[in-house]
Amino acid sequence: MDIVGIAWAALMVVFTFSLSLVVWGRSGL
């Protein structure tokens, strides 16, 4: 595994997690 691939995967995880928090927050959960 190269460092760029790991960094890109980590970025996608953080982005997906933050987006989920925004959606849940607007849903009132």
Swiss-Prot record:
Cited Pfam families: PetN
CC terms in the record's Gene Ontology section: chloroplast thylakoid membrane; cytochrome b6f complex
One annotated GO molecular function: electron transporter, transferring electrons within cytochrome b6/f complex of photosystem II activity
Coiled coil spans: none
Predominant cellular place of this UniProt entry's protein: plastid
Stretches that traverse the bilayer: 3-23
Membrane topology: Single-pass membrane protein
Function: Component of the cytochrome b6-f complex, which mediates electron transfer between photosystem II (PSII) and photosystem I (PSI), cyclic electron flow around PSI, and state transitions.
Name under which the protein is recorded: Cytochrome b6-f complex subunit 8
Species whose genome carries this gene: Cryptomeria japonica (Japanese cedar)
Taxonomic placement: Eukaryota, Viridiplantae, Streptophyta, Embryophyta, Tracheophyta
Gene name of the record: petN
